[in-house]
């Protein structure tokens, strides 16, 4: 039976190292002797229910660890369920009861170290690069045991589309990229090309989809790179990724420092592998794949003609003639000049050494977690190519388990975890609901959560001359996952700072030892560092690149990948934190904080769409963006009465509320750049919770409360018997095209909305 282990309990290794005793680390382990017959039956039922209903909802409810935690804590829901019949007659007691039920359930899910574990997967291209890397290096069976492979195959079966392909993410129609690499993944873990199973001939259907759509030469660049290192594609059919790029000076329009942090991290490993033209040693399976993936004989393919191919199903960012001409020029210079004698000895070898120096620096600085599962695979493979027995590679191997997550739908690979983000957003609604009569359960939850925040803050900048190594300050920030990962993010920092400021106001006998005030100041320094001239704030690093550089993006299936950008959600979160900070510490960098807030408000107001919404970047999409925008404006003192953008935002939500009283936004909004409801205008619990929060913050309860009551009725009536809420559509996103699953959102935004709603009822009802 699978068990989730937390922190130092998650196992140790001589090649692991940590900054805070592994606080926030979460590792799945298989124990053949664990689990009673009843527990095992419950797990199988959860798996069966997902498989039977996967055509209805594509994402798992993340039940396995929740079942484990609830059993271990002896959870029992004793508070009776509330059912609302007439929205206009909701009583304070009804809303409060629903909130208490949800809190009782949710607090039982907190880990001992103070964070809330959760799945953070969804993209269908996270698994295969790691599997391919481990296969090439000969460590597949060490990392992916028989039990791992059973769950991996289960996941692939569950998320294969009816046409035989896999989508970019679990809700997407099939694309070439994910179908090709997942087909390869299944073949590597032992599924035969014509294997018959309960789902039909999975590989047969996938191969048919690939061949019917032109073959694997139509996979985008990242897929071509995965295939090239495996030896089932030729490097000459890839757009160039020369390691000499890292020699470009900072005065050049594009250089290592101007790249978006994720593209830099991926390109760093790929440029080394490309520069070496590394290809795995052929195996019988590799030779079979060469014949299985293409409609023509492998030896007859003209790779030069495949370089710019990309299946129409994959194409989100089409290349222009100018872009194709640019990459052709880079290829000629890189391969016809730099890769030939004497330049291959004088320049190429020096570039490869520089690339590995950069790569090792980045890996050490983030404890070999890297920036995500895709760069992780390329970094790890590059280290193995450099030295198969080296310490760098062994340190990478020790961190692979940090990416593995087990759900009722099988084994998936995460980005690298959302521990901090999920935790700090959970603490927000708990802190918003703090009253004089806080019970022991809530107090204990808050204290543990505060302790987690204190231990998770990044307290140092990257080592040595970090600017030369394309790193920026990190001291004072909080990461998306855990401290060891080492990449602080602006919104994670802002939301954590706001929580710590609220804890700072509480008596020590309630919350224990408080955070050093200097660390609060460090967080403010980090946020101020990231604001751009336009008033917006970026996510990881200052926005140094020119927007026209996006025209030369080599990545076909996502948008905005070349340079760092400002984000409305991050800006809203930062305003919330800094307005609270200015109230408690009005003299610290007073003018800079005031200027940040003023410019940030203008940035948010300038970004508002014609319909009154804001386009979100990290969630689906216009409701999500509107929530963070309005939250920032309200924190800065704006109201429905003195702020036209807030009035327009409220009108947008009232206009899009469905007949049931809820909201449900489709991820297609992200692609169409226009609000798009779910098919049939059905309700989604996350969208409804977020919209309900905006209406309350916008003062709708004081003007016409019925739309708010109708939305609250939806949230209350959707609550399950145990206090949980139903898992529906995926509501996280990145790069405007890739869904990222946050199963905890169904709890966070439902309970946060109910918290604000009960407070509004208490104020208004006699």
From Swiss-Prot:
Its EC number is 4.2.1.124. Coiled coil: none annotated. GO terms for molecular function: arabidiol synthase activity; lyase activity. The active site is at 491 (proton donor). Keywords: Lyase, Repeat. GO terms for cellular component: lipid droplet. PFTB repeats lie at residues 149-190, 520-561, 597-637, 646-687. It is an enzyme of class 4 (lyase). GO terms for biological process: tricyclic triterpenoid biosynthetic process; triterpenoid biosynthetic process. Converts oxidosqualene to arabidiol. Minor production of arabidiol 20,21-epoxide. This is Arabidiol synthase. The lineage of its organism: Eukaryota, Viridiplantae, Streptophyta, Embryophyta, Tracheophyta.
